[in-house]
Design a protein with these regions (language model features):
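Short amphipathic alpha-helix that is part of the acyltransferase structural core
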Residues: 1-31
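A structural micro-motif
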Residues: 2, 43, 97-98
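Active-site rim helix/loop that mediates acceptor-substrate recognition in acyltransferases
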Residues: 22-50
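Feature marks short, surface-exposed loop/turn motifs that line or immediately flank catalytic pockets
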Residues: 64, 76, 108
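Conserved acetyl-CoA-binding loop-helix of GNAT-fold acetyltransferases
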Residues: 74, 80-93
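Conserved GNAT acetyl-CoA-binding A-motif
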Residues: 95-113
Length: 114
């Protein structure tokens, strides 16, 4: 079971979060981290923890009854253990009446982050 923790620059695993963000998403798709850290009511940047272990994060924007997951990444050492699904469950629980939108890409075997 994952625990959701809002991410700030003071987060204990901020360096690891930043590293995962850079490793998981191509530069052309990333936005500045400061934009993800805004926490302005419409945006969320949340880490998932299994006990004390940082597993991954998501970033989402909510407008009305739509929550759009912009970024979701799981530490590569922890993939295929259900953490991605658990992270989606966290989003759904935080927004029980919203439609959840997730953009997904097919794996590209030639991509450097595969």
């Amino acid at each position: 079971m994952l625990t959701a923790v809002p991410i700030t620059t003071d987060s204990k695993d901020f360096k690891e979060i930043k590293h995962l963000y850079i490793a998981a998403f191509p530069k052309s798709e990333r936005v500045p981290l400061r934009d993800l850290l805004r926490h302005d009511g419409a945006s969320e940047f949340v880490a998932g923890y299994d006990g004390e272990t940082f597993c991954g994060f998501y970033s989402a924007l909510t407008f009305g009854d739509i929550t759009h997951i912009l970024f979701l990444a799981i530490d590569e050492r922890l993939r295929a253990h259900g953490y991605g699904s658990a992270m989606l469950d966290i989003v759904a629980a935080a927004h029980p009446h919203n439609r959840i939108i997730v953009d997904a890409e097919a794996e590209d075997p030639a991509a450097s982050n595969n």
